[in-house]
Amino acid sequence: MTDKITVIVTLYNRLEYARNMILALQQQTKQIDELIFVDDGSSEKLMDFISDLLVDCKFKIKHVYQDDIGFRLARSRNNGAREASGDYLIFLDQDVIFNNDFIENIYNSRRKKRMIFSEALLSSLEERNKIQELINQKF
């Protein structure tokens, strides 16, 4: 039996990051089983925004919506965890950028019973835009 992996992404507006997340996860060397977007009251309609990507997507995508009554990151993550069907949950923010072997590295670390944690690498908006341009060139 294969372990199921769920990625839970907190989201608020800036829906282009949701598209980038789906595209990046489709390029992973280890595929996930489920992607859950926990939307903290975005004004735009997420599923309409990503509908063209759903056709060829190899993993299930869920959208969990909660009303925007202020920044509630912990509640968003808890709501995503409640909806998850995976054996292993990976929590990400909407604007994270990662390598194509990111999921595989986390999965392999888990199999070796290592502690798994993540640390943010802060970058300027200019650096982030350059990175995003490079990513978009691949797709």
What annotation goes with each model-predicted range?
Residues 101-139:
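Conserved donor NDP-sugar-binding/catalytic core segment of glycosyltransferases
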Residues 67-84:
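Glycine-rich, basic loop-to-helix element that forms the pyrophosphate-binding segment
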Residues 22-23, 47, 86, 100-111:
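Short alpha-helix within the catalytic core of nucleotide-sugar-dependent glycosyltransferases
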Residues 39-50, 96:
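A conserved acidic beta->alpha catalytic loop
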Residues 14-27:
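Short, well-formed alpha-helical segments that are part of the catalytic scaffolds
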Residues 89:
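Short aromatic/hydrophobic "clamp" motif used to bind/position activated sugar donors
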Residues 4-6, 34:
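Cell-envelope/extracellular polymer assembly enzymes that use nucleotide-activated donors
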Residues 33-42, 64-66:
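Short beta-strand/loop segment that forms part of the nucleotide-sugar
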